[in-house]
A protein has these predicted regions:
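Generic alpha-helical transmembrane segments of integral inner-membrane proteins
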Residues: 19, 23, 27, 31, ...
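Short alpha-helical transmembrane segments in multi-pass integral membrane proteins
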Residues: 1-15, 72-137, 185-241, 297-364, ...
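Short runs within selected transmembrane alpha-helices of multi-pass transporters and secretion channels
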Residues: 65, 134-153, 160-168, 193-208, ...
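Small-residue-rich hydrophobic transmembrane alpha-helices
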Residues: 44-107, 141-160, 258, 271-335, ...
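Short loop-to-helix capping motifs
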Residues: 120, 156-157, 265, 384, ...
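Transmembrane helical elements of multi-pass membrane transporters/channels
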Residues: 13-32, 133, 144, 167, ...
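Helix-terminus/linker motif at the lipid-water interface of multi-pass membrane proteins
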Residues: 23, 27-45, 114-121, 177-188, ...
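Transmembrane alpha-helix boundary and packing residues in multipass membrane permease domains
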Residues: 18, 22, 33-34, 70, ...
Length: 451
């Protein structure tokens, strides 16, 4: 067992590159939005609504990445490299099947998909063109997401970071080229953003394959892509399926919150949009350490070091709590700068809401940090993704969303108090999460002995 100082170095070594990857993902979205803003509001709306479809695919990828990460980390800790490669081949096969389904739907029926989200003819037309092009990125995106989750699970963090940086540069360069018609290319508008994304995803796969061909750690092998999986497939789905449902449930609840705020007024929506953006940047560190927790716990359990895994989980919880508090302090410190920046961009009412919302979302960040570390880090590291699915389904849809709805429409509380009720969601489920944590049933070695 590592001493506390060496453990902090090890955890930070895993977490910081993941934080960079998450930050880059945020920057890509910001860059797309800013550049599309120069095209038209219709282009921005079309891209945003079309991405609601791809968001469902992202949830599926995240579930597959969770199953890949947990199983690979445990078998890597056990020293079973062959099974790690079998898991990678299985996950890539599943991701390709899912990607093909989403590709066929978006490529052949883009108008039908867009009509689910809007009835604006201009937005439907632009979004349909966007979907037809970006659908080609799905197969590449699925491959790279699964491959990089496998690398992270065995502690190979730098390649995913480098890949994301290269992808960001390629994406931004291609977007600028195709949106503004640089270097002699025609101006493609929103279609150019989709084309830039496709090229960026192809670049990611190219880097992954080059690494795989020259790696002595883990390789993507065609024979495992087509091999029968049997019990390994069942183990994979047992972890991945609840993770997917968990993320979908959480995402729909977030959309329900947004709908409630949207019916209160535009000032609430605008203030919440800024507050969420700010707190998401602050949460990058928490999520980085949460992902590191999954890797650390899984590897120790794979080694059958149950007590060590439990102690490391306790240490990661303390680290994540400290990081969350630091994030809160930083956000509160820059709060005056944020308010000054938006002073001439928001109405006086929206600005007054934003001033209070930033405070509320920062203390909610502490709750999110704790729950994410335990549910997504410790519990999933032990192969227990089912608990998170159950607790989020119950507390989000039977407690948090109804409570916010009642506060807004039945008790008709002032908007700020409605927002306060909404931010209680992380703390409402926390007692149950801690009870599950202290029972330690999640400390499980889920590996098997294969020939």
């Amino acid at each position: 067992m590592l001493n506390k100082k060496d453990f902090l170095k090890y955890a930070s070594k895993l977490a910081f590159p993941i934080m960079i990857q998450n930050l880059i993902g945020t920057l890509v979205n910001i860059a797309d939005t800013v550049m599309l803003g120069y095209v038209s509001q219709t282009a921005m709306s079309a891209s945003s609504l079309a991405n609601q479809y791809t968001f469902i695919l992202f949830c599926l990828y995240y579930g597959m990445a969770t199953g890949t990460s947990v199983l690979c980390a445990q078998y890597w800790g056990k020293g079973d490299k062959k099974t790690v490669e079998r898991i990678l081949g299985l996950a890539e096969r599943i991701s390709l099947i899912v990607s093909l389904i989403f590709f066929v739907i978006s490529f052949t029926m883009p108008v039908t998909v867009m009509k689910i989200f809007t009835n604006s003819p201009d937005t439907i037309a632009a979004g349909s063109e966007y979907l037809k092009v970006i659908s080609f990125s799905f197969m590449f995106m699925g491959f790279s997401q699964v491959f990089m989750s496998a690398l992270r699970s065995i502690g190979k963090i730098m390649l995913p970071s480098i890949t994301y940086i290269v992808s960001l540069c390629v994406n931004v360069l291609c977007n600028a080229t195709f949106i503004f018609g640089l270097f002699g290319f025609p101006k493609l508008g929103v279609t150019g953003v989709a084309l830039g994304t496709v090229i960026a995803r192809i670049t990611e796969v190219f880097i992954c394959l080059i690494y795989s061909l020259n790696s002595s750690d883990v390789r993507f092998r065609i024979k495992y892509f087509f091999a029968k999986s049997g019990i390994l497939f069942q183990d994979f789905m047992k972890i991945a399926t609840p993770a997917v449902i968990n993320d979908v449930v959480w995402s729909f609840a977030t959309s329900a919150f947004a709908a409630i705020l949207g019916h209160i007024g535009d000032d609430m929506v605008a203030a919440n949009a800024v507050a969420v953006m700010v707190v998401n940047i602050g949460a990058i560190a928490c999520r980085g350490f949460s992902n590191a927790t999954t890797i650390i716990i899984s590897q120790e359990l794979g080694k059958d070091q149950i007590d060590t895994a439990g102690e490391y989980g306790k240490r990661m919880l303390r680290i994540t709590l400290a990081v969350s508090l630091i994030g809160c302090v930083i956000i509160l410190a820059i709060r005056p700068l944020i308010l000054d920046f938006y002073r001439d961009k928001l109405t006086e009412t929206a600005l007054s809401y934003l001033s209070i919302f930033i405070i509320m979302t920062t203390w909610r960040l502490v709750g999110e940090g704790i729950n994410t570390c335990l549910i997504c880090g410790c519990f999933r590291g032990g192969g227990d993704s089912r608990f998170g699915m159950i607790v989020d389904s119950i507390f989000m849809w039977l407690v948090a969303v109804p409570a916010t709805f009642l506060a807004a429409y039945v008790f008709k509380l002032p908007p700020v108090w409605v927002y306060f009720v909404m931010t209680l969601d992380e703390f409402e489920k926390m007692p149950v999460v801690f009870i599950h944590y202290f029972r330690k049933k999640w400390l499980t070695n889920i590996t098997r002995d294969f020939d």
